Amino acid sequence: MYSTSKEIIMIGYSTIGVKDIEKAKKFYCDLFDATVQVDVGRLAMIGKSADAPMIAVCTPYNGNAPECGNGTMVAYTMSSKDEVKAKHAKALSLGATDEGEPGQRIDDVFYGAYVRDPDGNKIAFYIFG
């Protein structure tokens, strides 16, 4: 049964596995002009504030190498198509690899761009419209 509640469910944070925690903290802090909100050594939560959505980077708890999920992607909403373009370019300048240049993906519905961070995690920047 689906809920009929009008309450919006908001993601608090998404976690991705990384090889080098210091390199990952720098990449995401620089990419989003954000800061580390929580740092417990093998895990760091990065965002604008601790009460807003964050990205968490961590070395896997089991000690194994991190693996990118097949079909897994973290998508970040932008305020304009120009911001999608700028964030894509900034990610590339910080060492990300291109997975799809900025462009209209669904006519009049979805404009996006895709990269992989230095650990291979797929990221999207998008705006509806």
Language-model features, listed with the residues they occupy:
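Conserved active-site alpha-helix within GNAT-family acetyltransferase domains
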Residues: 22-31, 113, 122
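Conserved acetyl-CoA-binding loop of GNAT-fold acetyltransferases
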Residues: 30-37, 96-97
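Conserved short beta-strand elements that form part of the metal-binding/catalytic scaffold
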Residues: 35-69, 123-127
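Vicinal oxygen chelate
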Residues: 1-7, 11-19, 49, 65-129
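A cross-family glycoside hydrolase active-site/sugar-binding cleft signature
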Residues: 58, 75-77, 101-102, 126
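N-terminal beta-strand motif that seeds the catalytic metal site of vicinal oxygen chelate
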Residues: 1-25, 52, 74-76, 129
